[in-house]
Amino acid sequence: MPLTPNDIHNKTFTKSFRGYDEDEVNEFLAQVRKDYEIVLRKKTELEAKVNELDERIGHFANIEETLNKSILVAQEAAEDVKRNSQKEAKLIVREAEKNADRIINESLSKSRKIAMEIEELKKQSKVFRTRFQMLIEAQLDLLKNDDWDHLLEYEVDAVFEEKE
């Protein structure tokens, strides 16, 4: 059991023939008692401060643990977001590729259709040209016909005179 200031104060020594001066010993013990009380008081204060600091350390340890957990949760959430973003990006790329293929196929189909229409128009223009040429040639033949000369010889006045 540790020594207390009262133990120091109440300590008695046996007297011997050539012993110490009693007043001097009592003064020294009184001084030791005062110093010991100061040391004990400081010890108590320091223990209280240590307890307070231990509580604060515990509090900060809890905060640290909470922050570490929060960081882990945030990292996991970030990884989830990253994974989901990558999946979504792949889906978008896949969808874009499908759309591109569809657009290309539609364009090829339209270009084939237009090419077929062009060929059909070429055929129709050849037919039209041939028919038009035949019409013009027929008209030229009519113009070259001698019947026109006969019409020019026909006199209109003579027709009116006959009717009168």
From Swiss-Prot:
It is found in: Cytoplasm. Changing residue 18 to A/C: Localization at cytoplasmic foci instead of the cell pole. Stable interaction with Spo0J and association with the chromosome. GO terms for molecular function: identical protein binding. Residues 29-107 form a coiled coil. Changing residue 19 to A: Localized at cytoplasmic foci. One of its GO terms (cellular component) is cytoplasm. Pfam families: DivIVA (PF05103). GO terms for biological process: division septum assembly; peptidoglycan-based cell wall biogenesis; sporulation resulting in formation of a cellular spore. Keywords: Cell cycle, Cell division, Coiled coil, Cytoplasm, Septation, Sporulation. Belongs to the DivIVA family. NCBIfam families: DivI1A_domain. May act as a pilot protein, directing MinCD to the polar septation sites or by inhibiting MinCD at the midcell site of division. Required for polar localization of the chromosome during sporulation. Oligomers. Interacts with FtsZ, MinD, MinJ and Spo0J. The association with Spo0J is transient and occurs at a specific point during development. Overexpression of DivIVA is lethal. This is Septum site-determining protein DivIVA. It comes from Bacillus subtilis (strain 168).
